[in-house]
Amino acid sequence: MASTSCFLHHHALTAAARSSSSPRQAALPKSPQLLVCRAQKQQPAQEEEGGVVSRRLALTVLIGAAALGSKVSPADAAYGEAANVFGKPKSNTDYLPYSGDGFKLSIPSKWNPSKEREFPGQVLRYEDNFDSNSNLSVIINPTDKKSIKDFGSPEEFLSKVDYLLGKQAYFGKTASEGGFDPDAVATANILEATASNVNGKDYYFVSVLTRTADGDEGGKHQLITATVNDGKLYICKAQAGDKRWFKGARKFVEGAASSFSVA
């Protein structure tokens, strides 16, 4: 870095120097002052600045090396979420993992275990803290089938386990109204029926909307996931009332049903 230094020099007149030998010196005007400016390099300052630059460069290299060694995954922060660069990925607190006898699934974290047993072979039941109509069950029964496909199509399979949907309690004469057939007070509509293969295992998935004449909850959405493994028929049934289905329960019912799998 360059700096400017200024010095004052007294300039003596030549005539004054020549007359110094005279016995009588004439009064001379004051010598004019000459301002001289010189540009000089300040070597120590430059070296100090160079040291600062070197330290900054070294710090940059260290930060870059730390970033490469941290192995931060871009997936740690989803779109619209705050990045969690220096911590572990955030876990999903909406569900709790559950491992049972030969099966596993994710259970909504705000659902509690229930001792109620609705179906033969039922080994697990959880329900919503605030509404028991929102619940899930796991049923395991022996079977001579080798694959879920041996039951026929997903619709045919459902007809063989229709007890899962509930039986109508009233059997009498009724008029045809409200979309129900004569003498019928309950109905079931298949909304979706699919087959899939996961890790070499065949699964059936059926989504059903059941309604009763009393209009309770406007009906129930019942999701059934089923498969066969080691001579056993595994069924996971998750459901929610129609009103709560559209108020947020759908996410948890679908999440639980789709997470079900066998070992």
Swiss-Prot record:
Residues 1-77 form a transit peptide. Pfam families: PsbP. The keyword Thylakoid applies. Keywords: Chloroplast, Membrane, Photosynthesis, Photosystem II, Plastid, Thylakoid, Transit peptide. Transmembrane segments: none annotated. It comes from the Eukaryota. Belongs to the PsbP family. This is Oxygen-evolving enhancer protein 2, chloroplastic. It comes from Cucumis sativus (Cucumber).
